[in-house]
Design a protein with these regions (language model features):
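Extracellular jelly-roll beta-sandwich "head" domains, especially the C-terminal globular C1q domain
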Residues: 3-6, 14-161
């Protein structure tokens, strides 16, 4: 009975929670260069439990608690007006360095637009480690590349371990 009360009190007081956590979106369409990794300027917070996401200058998540974090980011790649999309990549960078990515490739049958979601688990030190969302859009004509704001987003939360 005493253990049940301790667990219940911890849950209701917030002592056990998947925080810090955040979810943010791209506030408006972002123009990007053709075939180049570009940071997504994620600037519209949906929520940010511990004020760890910078939505105004660096567009990065710097959690203030050490541990493992589940992070996810989606890039909506749009080549402009033509149906000549070659590929879209979505990747998460840690401390300014590329870690991993997901992609969709249309080289054999060009597309119009695509969303690519990437997820991963990251060890964070709780002080200086940070995560950022990057994307890469490539099209045959090489002009008009953009991240569409309707479906480009970034989020993360601490995993209870």
């Amino acid at each position: 009975m005493a253990i049940t009360k301790i667990i219940a009190d911890s849950i209701t007081s917030g002592a056990i929670a998947n925080t810090p956590a955040f979810l943010a979106t791209l506030g408006s369409t972002q123009s990007v260069g053709d075939n180049s990794w570009t940071k997504a300027n994620i600037n519209t917070e949906i929520f940010d439990t511990d004020n760890c996401f910078d939505a105004s200058t660096n567009y990065r998540f710097t959690p203030n608690k050490a541990g493992k974090y589940f992070a996810f980011g989606q890039i909506f790649g749009d080549p402009g007006s033509a149906s000549d999309l070659v590929y879209v990549y979505s990747g998460i960078y840690k401390n300014g360095s590329f870690v991993r990515y997901s992609s969709i490739d249309f080289r054999n049958n060009l597309g119009r637009e695509a969303t690519v979601l990437h997820t991963g688990i990251f060890d964070m030190n709780g002080s200086s480690d940070y995560l950022e969302l990057y994307g890469n859009v490539n099209a045959n004509d090489g002009s008009g590349m953009k991240f569409n704001n309707n479906h480009t987003y970034f989020g993360a939360y601490k995993i209870l371990t």
